[in-house]
């Protein structure tokens, strides 16, 4: 049985129930960054072997977005800043243990697991961008290990994206809120 504090995904509220206030956590930059990244990553992935020009353009745009996000992580709004969501591995483990029992606290902004995921995805994107750029330079032109590393990072990122989406769905169910609209 589901613990009493977990709201059912399709809970029906009485007509006279007070409306829950909508809290917009993510600033416009974070929203635009996120969905632009989704689109550009999709384009880059889809064109990797088909259209070098489009693939490179998407890759450079991703690198630019990541650079801007890194800066925004230090100077942006409260919940966009790294110091708001980067937690120690111990706190991430504790949070995950609570989440597995549907007892994780509700967090405005990224929860500890989400913060760790953001760091992992940013690291992957930096690695993908760096190896992609390396393949365009004379010293690494045709270096098979660079291309293999680039592709391995892409596929590792896809795995992280699946875990990220699963985490958002899980947390949305656990807390009875649509995190995509947060």
Regions found by a protein language model. Give the residues of each.
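Membrane-embedded alpha-helical bundles that constitute the cytochrome b-like, heme-associated redox core
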Residues: 1-182
């Amino acid at each position: 049985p589901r613990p009493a504090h977990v709201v059912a995904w399709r809970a029906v509220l009485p007509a006279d129930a007070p409306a829950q206030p909508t809290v917009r956590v993510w600033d416009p930059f974070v929203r635009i960054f996120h969905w632009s990244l989704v689109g550009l990553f999709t384009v880059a992935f889809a064109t990797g072997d088909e259209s070098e020009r489009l693939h490179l353009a998407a890759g450079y745009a991703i690198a630019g977005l990541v650079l801007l996000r890194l800066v925004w992580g230090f100077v942006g709004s409260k919940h966009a800043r790294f110091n708001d969501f980067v937690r120690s591995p111990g706190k991430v483990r504790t949070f995950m243990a609570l989440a597995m029992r549907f007892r994780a606290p509700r967090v405005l902004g990224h929860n500890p697991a989400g913060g760790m995921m953001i760091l992992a995805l940013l690291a992957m994107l930096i690695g993908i961008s760096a190896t992609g750029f390396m393949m365009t330079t004379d010293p690494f032109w045709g270096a098979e290990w660079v291309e293999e590393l680039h592709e391995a990072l892409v596929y590792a990122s896809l795995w992280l994206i699946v875990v990220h989406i699963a985490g958002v769905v899980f947390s949305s169910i656990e807390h009875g809120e649509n995190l995509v609209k947060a």
